[in-house]
Amino acid sequence: MKVIPAIDLMDGQVVRLRRGKAKDKTVYSDDPVKVALTWEKDGADMLHIVDLDATLGRGNNIDMIRNITDAVSIPVEAAGGLRSIDLVAGALEGADRVVLGTLAFRDRDALREILESYGSKKIVISVDHVKGKIMVDGWRENTGINLVDAMQGFVGAGFTEFLLTDVDRDGMMQGPETDTLGKVCRMSDSHVIASGGITVPGDVKSVRDAGAWGVILGKALYEGKVSVKGAISC
């Protein structure tokens, strides 16, 4: 299973939010490149970089993301605010792949064009949910779309890479919800990355046993509860 540290960027800093709320922010570093190099040195398989300012429509961290992708040699996936074909194209000039959430649910024509242009391995569909219902727009809008139905539709359309985030558990350090994860992983041979709730090393094993292809390490990593090396050895 791939071990993937998250680097969430806001105002050029590495931060973590609780349940995606900007007012509930903790700053962990003023040097995102140094953080990225640390996780790479520790053995991370990939980096998951989220531009929270772009997600929330309050600017972007494009230059900082470019600095990170220039500095590391491991793959980088970029997420946050990629809601147009042009923004996706720009992100892929530096990142190895992009994570699409709001665009995937609101603009199927653009999504189809992106798939045709870049192929399924470059596109990660973000299926963020609260109690099995899809959330978009920086987790501010509940679409009412059923998670399993959405996954089946995307798999049928040719997508193979997914990021599953349990919004209620993100940044809360309450442990992952593995029942839904297991159900989603059993649906197809697609790659599913689990995100949200990882708190102790045993949680990493739990999501691996549920069938996850990868796991995002967020707040627990920055709080010292889980290490990259420890997650790899689980």
Swiss-Prot record:
A Gene Ontology biological process term: L-tryptophan biosynthetic process
Catalytic activity: 1-(5-phospho-beta-D-ribosyl)-5-[(5-phospho-beta-D-ribosylamino)methylideneamino]imidazole-4-carboxamide = 5-[(5-phospho-1-deoxy-D-ribulos-1-ylimino)methylamino]-1-(5-phospho-beta-D-ribosyl)imidazole-4-carboxamide
Chief location of this protein within or outside the cell: cytoplasm
Principal EC category: isomerase
Localization per Swiss-Prot or TrEMBL: Cytoplasm
Keyword Acetylation applies: no
Catalytic site positions: 8, 128
MF annotations from Gene Ontology: 1-(5-phosphoribosyl)-5-[(5-phosphoribosylamino)methylideneamino]imidazole-4-carboxamide isomerase activity
EC code: 5.3.1.16
Pathway assigned to this chain's UniProt record: Amino-acid biosynthesis; L-histidine biosynthesis; L-histidine from 5-phospho-alpha-D-ribose 1-diphosphate: step 4/9
Gene Ontology cellular component list: cytoplasm
InterPro entries documented for this protein: Aldolase_TIM, His_biosynth, HisA_bact_arch, Isoase_HisA-like, Isoase_HisA-like_bact, RibuloseP-bd_barrel
Entry keyword DNA repair: no
Similarity section: Belongs to the HisA/HisF family.
Protein's name in the database: 1-(5-phosphoribosyl)-5-[(5-phosphoribosylamino)methylideneamino] imidazole-4-carboxamide isomerase
Gene: hisA
